[in-house]
Regions:
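Short beta-strand elements in bilobed, periplasmic/extracellular small-molecule ligand-binding domains
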Residues: 55-68, 153-158, 173-194
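Flexible loop/hinge segments that line or gate small-molecule binding clefts
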Residues: 97-135, 142-147, 153, 247-255, ...
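Hinge/cleft segment of the Venus flytrap/periplasmic-binding protein
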Residues: 175-176, 275-328
């Protein structure tokens, strides 16, 4: 099922209008945030940031995309958005090969496009806002290597082909390359359904001897809590689980000790800064949107805005839990 939400900016008084220096803005300026898996808490947080920026700038924000992991449905929403000729599009790319033509079509139509969360560097998008996913993988890989003492079998849960997840996997591989006794025995494609992670974890927990799995690594947000649940149900306490993102369930599993650590991202910031950047571009359009600004040393646009990552474990989980509670 596809969901679409709309924020209409509230009219302001002339005095406030002048005080906020927003005279150039209008609710007729429509910006889109497009992503797959909108039902995830991660995207609820990104939407909150996007809408907060829309409210601040007195513009209209629309959030569109499938509630589940469906790149084809995301493409349909992108095509609908391009046809509507909005002021700008912010998009998380579930499948670069599939979505690249739509992104390029938007740019060709004079619509600024910025990617967030998951990039499409081969497209004509202007730049990327989000996590340094290689660094995220390095953080997790270092913790796994430390906890395993440099030896053991590991299983990943991912959705191969999604650019940000592939980059995180590469980050882990970079670290494991210096620990040759850490073996990756599987990268499970959960296909957008965390239940696949649960089922596979149960099967891998039954393996013993040289096939024993010592660690489970979740490269996306939904798998962590179900992997932890599978481990808990079998009353196993000697396996390492590393998750992704800081939803309440994941933080609770860290407090419980079932999840060793998670890698935090800043989806609110991605949504907020994304709309802010689109607004600036819309009101100061370059001579050419299709130019490759990444190779221009004098470009007014960055290649990448890093919104930050951090490793969250028992030592700092309460800080993240309080922050989440403050923003509910």
């Amino acid at each position: 099922m596809t969901s679409i939400r709309r924020l209409i900016a509230i009219a302001i008084t002339p005095a406030l209008f002048m005080a906020t220096s927003c005279g150039r803005h209008s609710t007729s300026e429509v910006f889109y945030l497009i992503a797959a898996n909108l039902s995830l808490p991660y995207w609820k947080t990104a939407e909150t940031g996007f809408n907060a920026a829309a409210a601040r700038y007195r513009v209209t924000g629309k959030v569109a995309g499938p509630d589940n992991y469906d790149p084809q449905a995301e493409l349909q929403e992108l095509n609908h958005a391009v046809a509507a000729k909005p002021a700008g599009i912010l998009i998380s790319v579930a499948d670069e090969g599939l979505l690249k033509p739509g992104i390029d079509a938007a740019i060709a139509a004079g619509i600024p496009v910025i990617t967030i969360d998951s990039d499409a560097p081969s497209s004509r998008r202007l730049f990327f806002i989000g996590t340094n996913n290689l660094d995220a993988g390095h953080l997790g890989g270092e913790r796994i290597a430390e906890r395993l003492g440099g030896r053991g079998n590991v299983v990943f849960y991912s959705m191969p082909g999604q650019p940000n997840l592939d980059e995180r996997l590469q980050g882990y591989k970079d670290i494991f390359a210096t620990h040759p006794d850490i073996k990756i025995i599987d990268v499970v494609n959960i296909k957008g359904d965390a239940r696949n992670a649960f089922d596979n974890t149960q099967q891998y927990l039954a393996q013993t001897g040289v096939a024993r799995v010592s660690a489970f690594i979740c490269l996306e947000a939904s798998s962590g809590k179900v992997v932890a649940d599978a481990v808990r149900r079998q009353k196993i306490t000697d396996r390492v689980v590393v998750a992704m993102d800081v939803d309440q369930d994941t933080l609770a599993e860290i407090k419980d000790g079932t999840i060793e650590a998670t890698i935090s991202q800043k989806p609110f910031t991605m949504g907020y800064v994304g709309l802010k950047q689109l607004d600036e571009i819309f009101h100061n359009m370059p001579k050419s949107l299709s130019k490759d600004y990444s190779v221009d040393a004098f470009a007014e646009y960055p290649v990448f805005i890093d919104t930050g990552t951090a490793l969250v474990d028992k030592a700092n989980v309460d800080v993240y839990a309080r922050s989440a509670a403050d923003h509910q």
